[in-house]
Amino acid sequence: MRRYRRRLRQVQITGASIALASLFRPATDAPARASAGVAAALRILAGLLWLYNVSWKRPPDFGKDSGNGLYGFTQDAVDHPVLPPFSWLVETIVLPNFAFFGWGVLVVETLLAVLLLTGTLVRLAAIVGVVQSLSIGLSVAQTPGEWPWSYWLMIGVHVVLLFTAAGRIAAVDAVRGAAQSRRHTGELAAHRLAGGWGIVLLLTAVLAVALSMGDDPSAPSGATIGGPGLSVSLGSYNLIGAVVLAVVAALMLAATTLHSRMLAVAAGVVAAVAAASLYAQLGRTDAWLGGSNTSAAFFLCAAVVSFATAGQLGRTRRQSRTAARAVGG
């Protein structure tokens, strides 16, 4: 026993020495999978940024009547110009047509949140993220109290995502790539992605149920998962919204357990309908699920993952049945 402990201590010391030495070696030898994992984490972080950003893009006026919100930040491009031609564009085209512009921003930032969090079309999302981050920086970088470097860093993050394998891990792109490979590993990738998202959704639903206990089940403004303090949120849900989220999670987990394409499709349909119901009530104060733009985008993430993985779940069984029928025929 004493010899075992001595050996274990030697291994721990050796491991710590190797880890410490690696900090001083040239940063040229990172394993491909480790780099992909870090890129995936950066992608998810960027997705959470956009997921929170959509929470205060509130139709129908997007802050125009009060001069706050999206309208106030857009007005900063004129009041505190960064690039005069851009300020002219905002003043003469964007502000006079602000409702159209506001909806465009909401759509683009929702798209960024969904694509980056789910790892779908990551390189396309990265390009859109660069453009959107640049437009935000050109609007508010010179506004008093703003930190210009935050916007240059946002641009840099999306450039990194564009040129790295950010869709290799925990991503729909990984499922698509595996499905196209000769090794036919698409089903395993789909199982991992759908199962992982099912767990995340279930934990979120449990927390939402706990926070909404004692409140009106159909309260127009549900409990928020996260908050403005850290600028991180997975949406807000009343008890009904939390139950719907739990149903989606249960369907996704059942789909991975039973290798069922139909259950995955069902999860996608429920999530898509929930998101659509929230979008149908944008601008109202009596949302059925107690949700927000962020809640709708989170449901859309679940829908995208469910539909994207459905075709691969149970694929091996279906191929075996087809082969058996062919032999029997």
Predicted regions and their residues:
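Extended, low-polarity transmembrane helix blocks
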Residues: 2-82, 88, 93-107, 120-329
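Transmembrane-helix motifs of polytopic, lipid-linked glycan transferases
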Residues: 111-118
